[in-house]
């Protein structure tokens, strides 16, 4: 029972620390972003029960738990929450090992809409070529991005990645170090 209490304490400390960092980063962003329709921190933490399923390794279960599936189905009801989770799952800066294929297929594994995270798999534009700098046929502008991710600042994506990292790290730290 003491291990569970320590795990909860570690998770709470990580969430509070990340919330403080996210608040400071959001306040110092150079361009104002509209208020998010959903709290990405809360959405990422709701999927903590999916950790054992998305963690790489031979000990990962073949199916996500019922708790995990309930959380996934709840998140899928809000397109902004799906946008937050897509940004977190597909981030190249995620510091912890996560089986991205399993993470993106959580809805299908839980019996929900298999295409829910399909937009996550769309290739991102190449960062080496800025929009409008193509030497193509006379200045065709790039089409603006659609959906919740278009309105989000880069800081929001970074915050989402940090939150998912904390949600993954807290149970692992509690399990292996306490």
Swiss-Prot record:
It comes from Oryza sativa subsp. japonica. It is found in: Vacuole, Aleurone grain membrane. O-glycosylated on hydroxyprolines; noncontiguous hydroxylproline residues are glycosylated with arabinogalactan. GO terms for biological process: proteolysis. Expressed in roots, stems, leaves, flowers and seeds. Its main location: membrane. It is a lipid-anchor; GPI-anchor. The keyword Transcription does not apply. Residues 1-26 form the signal peptide. This is Non-specific lipid transfer protein-like 1. The keyword Kinase does not apply. InterPro entries: Bifun_inhib/LTP/seed_sf (IPR036312), Bifunc_inhib/LTP/seed_store (IPR016140), LTSS (IPR043325). Pfam families: LTP_2. Residues 150-178 form a propeptide. Glycans are attached at residue 99. The gene is LTPL1.
